């Protein structure tokens, strides 16, 4: 079979998608107002980079393509500014975090687009239950073979990405005792989890065409894998991260993945084999449940190692590429967070313990979301 086309990209160019919670300013609950928000944004600059998601209490911002994490950060701040200005006119707010702490998914409304209606008819309750919020990170690859190698090689580091981004300890009004409860939600979807062990772009092309011919998929979006190729963009897409509480944290995560990807593509240090996936689900669980304090099983070692230690060692190992990309400032901040066992899940638990109020927690998350913005017009003081 002929190869699927793959758009050539600059090596480790970056892009990101961030899903945010739409919050009612009075009740601090999720509110289904993305239709109204999209209408209000109709004539705004960057309109095409702000999109609805499958349920109406979600909104997504998309960056453009960048080589520099700093340039991406500047653009995200501009997108945030537009959201904040628009929110003020219709009395809503936004926050980060992988889950809303007390929402009930049964109350969510599907966004009335043709694609989302079709998905709801296919997956029914799973679609509403997927009202959780993530950051997706795109990494540019020169060729399809590079994309397949990177998809597999990054699987070794998925526990890192879950642990550093974890921001969803509360769900449906309970403490889940997971650092990232969001990362467990998509397991029920078909074609979730990991890509099959396909060794090159030819094998992936053959697999894709079979799945299409069998009418299991219609396009690449039907794969819900943790990491998936995006040939129309010339990228691979990492989909395991919770939405951070701040835009800056989203940049720390992106900067780390960018430098790691450059190291992997330049040096090819990960030997691809089925062994990568023998331990994958267990390592993923460790990161979802315990975050930075979880353990990681590496196939060439005899005993588990702490996820935190593995991240710190990896940062030292890829220092050359961090310097080359100019990501030092962001990685130094991330290193400090990791060595101090700090992620957003830890912070959310700490904020909740101060008052024991989910409403006050959401208000604090809304304030944190604005902390690196130029516009802090919105504030609420829940009773």
UniProtKB/Swiss-Prot annotation:
Catalysed reactions listed for this entry: L-cysteine + L-glutamate + ATP = gamma-L-glutamyl-L-cysteine + ADP + phosphate + H(+)
GO molecular function: ATP binding; glutamate-cysteine ligase activity
Pfam family, one: GCS2
UniProt entry tagged with the keyword ATP-binding: yes
Source organism superkingdom: Bacteria
UniProt keyword annotation of Cell cycle present: no
SUPFAM superfamilies listed in its UniProt record: Glutamine synthetase/guanido kinase
Coiled coil: none
EC number from the UniProt entry: 6.3.2.2
Any single biological process term in GO: modified amino acid biosynthetic process
Keywords, ordered alphabetically: ATP-binding, Ligase, Nucleotide-binding
Function, in words: ATP-dependent carboxylate-amine ligase which exhibits weak glutamate--cysteine ligase activity.
Cross-referenced PANTHER family: GLUTAMATE--CYSTEINE LIGASE 2-RELATED (PTHR36510:SF1)
Family, per entry: Belongs to the glutamate--cysteine ligase type 2 family. YbdK subfamily.
Annotated protein name in UniProt: Putative glutamate--cysteine ligase 2-2
UniProt source species: Legionella pneumophila (strain Lens)
């Amino acid at each position: 079979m002929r190869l699927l086309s793959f758009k050539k990209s600059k090596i480790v160019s970056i892009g990101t998608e961030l899903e945010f919670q739409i919050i009612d300013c009075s009740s601090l609950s999720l509110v289904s107002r993305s239709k109204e928000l999209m209408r209000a944004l109709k004539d705004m600059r960057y309109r095409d980079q702000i999109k609805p998601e499958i349920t109406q209490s979600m909104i997504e911002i998309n960056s453009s393509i960048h080589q520099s994490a700093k340039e991406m950060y500047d653009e995200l701040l501009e997108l945030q500014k537009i959201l904040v200005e628009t929110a003020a006119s219709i009395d809503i707010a936004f926050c980060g975090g992988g889950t809303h702490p007390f929402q009930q998914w049964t109350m969510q409304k599907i966004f009335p687009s043709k694609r989302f209606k079709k998905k709801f008819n296919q997956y029914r309750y799973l679609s509403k239950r997927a009202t959780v919020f993530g950051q997706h990170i795109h990494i540019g690859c020169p060729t399809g073979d590079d994309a397949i190698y990177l998809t597999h090689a990054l699987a070794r580091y998925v526990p890192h990405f879950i642990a550093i981004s974890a921001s969803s300890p509360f769900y449906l009004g309970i403490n889940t005792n997971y650092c990232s409860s969001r990362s467990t939600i998509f397991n029920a979807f078909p074609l979730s989890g990991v890509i099959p062990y396909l060794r090159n772009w030819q094998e992936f092309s053959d697999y894709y065409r079979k799945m299409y011919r069998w009418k299991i998929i219609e396009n690449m979006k039907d794969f819900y894998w943790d990491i998936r190729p995006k040939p129309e963009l010339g990228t691979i897409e990492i989909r395991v991260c919770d939405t951070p509480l701040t835009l800056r944290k989203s940049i720390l995560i992106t900067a780390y993945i960018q430098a790691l990807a450059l190291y992997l593509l330049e040096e090819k240090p990960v030997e691809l084999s089925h062994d990568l996936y023998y331990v994958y689900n267990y390592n993923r669980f460790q990161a979802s449940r315990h975050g930075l304090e979880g353990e990681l099983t590496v196939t060439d070692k005899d005993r588990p190692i702490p996820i935190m230690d593995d991240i710190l060692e990896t940062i030292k190992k890829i220092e050359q590429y961090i310097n080359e990309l100019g990501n030092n400032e962001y990685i130094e901040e991330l290193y400090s967070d990791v060595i101090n066992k700090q992620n957003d899940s830890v912070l959310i638990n700490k904020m909740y313990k101060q008052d024991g109020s989910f409403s006050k927690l959401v208000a604090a998350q809304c304030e944190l979301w604005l902390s690196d913005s130029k516009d802090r017009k919105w504030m609420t003081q829940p009773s």
